[in-house]
Swiss-Prot record:
One of its GO terms (biological process) is tRNA modification. It catalyses: adenosine(37) in tRNA + dimethylallyl diphosphate = N(6)-dimethylallyladenosine(37) in tRNA + diphosphate. GO terms for molecular function: ATP binding; tRNA dimethylallyltransferase activity. NCBIfam families: miaA (TIGR00174). It is an enzyme of class 2 (transferase). It comes from Burkholderia mallei (strain ATCC 23344). It comes from the Bacteria. Belongs to the IPP transferase family. Catalyzes the transfer of a dimethylallyl group onto the adenine at position 37 in tRNAs that read codons beginning with uridine, leading to the formation of N6-(dimethylallyl)adenosine (i(6)A). This is tRNA dimethylallyltransferase. InterPro entries: Dimethylallyltransferase, IPT, P-loop_NTPase. ATP binds at G17, P18, T19, A20, S21, G22, K23, T24. Substrate binds at T19, A20, S21, G22, K23, T24.
Length: 324
């Protein structure tokens, strides 16, 4: 964005951070001071019936402050970054038109990048292609499909673990639909970003000064989810004939581990440990994305007054006192 366009653009504050960094507390604290509406930037919160394992805001929290892009999709359905971008831009405009302040808050960095940088020309998901790949994986295993991907798109395969089923499937799907490797398509310039041209997104990032503190929070939160009935929640989902572990919804952190426990593949302790480890890995990926944003305003989420600091940073952004 040019200096002239930046000066005339409407600022949109964004509260980003990894799992368990305190985003909800900071957003609600800001809502006590300003007439905000929260637009969720979280790929797990879109799914209905997945409340405990996604740490969805409570009914009281959602009643106190308007929340958007929560409970909008059935777990049997997909929701893409392109759909998020269109929905988020529409909501930002509608909230501003009501005389209120939009606050984007969440930790799905792919969504944030799609919103702020636009999208490459990747094809939409194809159920038939995905069904074929799922069948191949059931027969041969995801490491075999990872090896297949390495033969056609070594750059993408190199950054994926052999069991990263969701991303391996997507990379193979893109190749089968376009005949081109995903790495080549992603290297192309994004499509025009006209819909966001009048907006200036400013990220406030909650990041840990001590990784061990965040890891302890993650473990405590996962244990609290288990005590709150997470296994029962997954069991209800598992009883549905139209849900399976290959769906994006069931790839949300914790759900696969709980499902496999219910299938008898692991014991309770192993399920817990795997769930916590998967959450820590998600946190690591989120921090990698954040640290690639030089424009972000960093708040130490481990500080005793982290919520106060985050609210202060967000208010500086909204008042035009943040660095340009």
């Amino acid at each position: 964005m040019s200096e002239r366009n930046a000066a005339s653009a409407r600022t949109v504050a964004c509260l980003l951070g990894p799992t368990a960094s305190g985003k909800t507390a900071a957003a609600l604290a800001l809502a006590a001071r300003r007439p905000i509406e929260i637009v969720s930037v979280d790929s797990a919160l879109v799914y209905r019936g997945m409340d405990i394992g996604t740490a969805k805001p409570t009914r009281d929290e959602r009643a106190a402050v308007p929340h958007h892009l929560i409970d909008i999709v059935d777990p049997a359905d997909a929701y893409s970054a392109a759909e998020f971008r269109a929905d988020a831009l529409r909501l930002v405009a509608q909230i501003a038109a009501r005389g209120r302040t939009p606050l984007l808050a969440g930790g799905t960095m792919l969504y944030y990048r799609a919103l702020t940088q636009g999208l490459n020309d990747l094809p939409a998901a194809d159920p038939d292609v995905r069904a074929t790949l799922d069948a191949d994986a059931a027969r041969d295993g995801w490491p075999a499909l990872h090896a297949r991907l390495a033969g056609i798109d070594p750059a993408t395969a190199a950054r994926l673990a052999p069991n990263d089923s969701q991303r391996i499937q997507r990379a193979l799907e893109v190749y089968l639909l376009t005949g081109q490797p995903m790495s080549a398509l992603l290297a192309a310039p994004p499509r025009d970003n006209d819909a966001a041209a009048g907006l200036r997104f400013v990220p406030v990032a909650l990041e840990p000064s001590e990784r061990a503190v965040l890891h302890a929070r993650i473990a405590a939160r996962f244990d609290a989810m288990l005590e709150a009935g997470f296994i029962d929640e997954v069991e209800r989902l598992r009883r549905r004939d139209d849900l399976h572990l290959g769906l994006p919804s069931m790839r949300c952190v914790g759900y696969r581990q709980a499902w496999e426990y219910l299938d008898g593949c692991t014991d309770y302790r192993t399920m817990r440990d795997k769930g916590i480890f998967a959450t820590r890995q998600l946190c690591k990926r989120q921090l990698t994305w954040l640290r690639a944003m030089p424009e972000r305003i960093v708040v130490d989420c481990c500080a005793p007054d982290a919520t106060v600091r985050a609210v202060d940073a967000l208010e500086r952004v909204l008042d035009g006192r943040a660095p340009a």
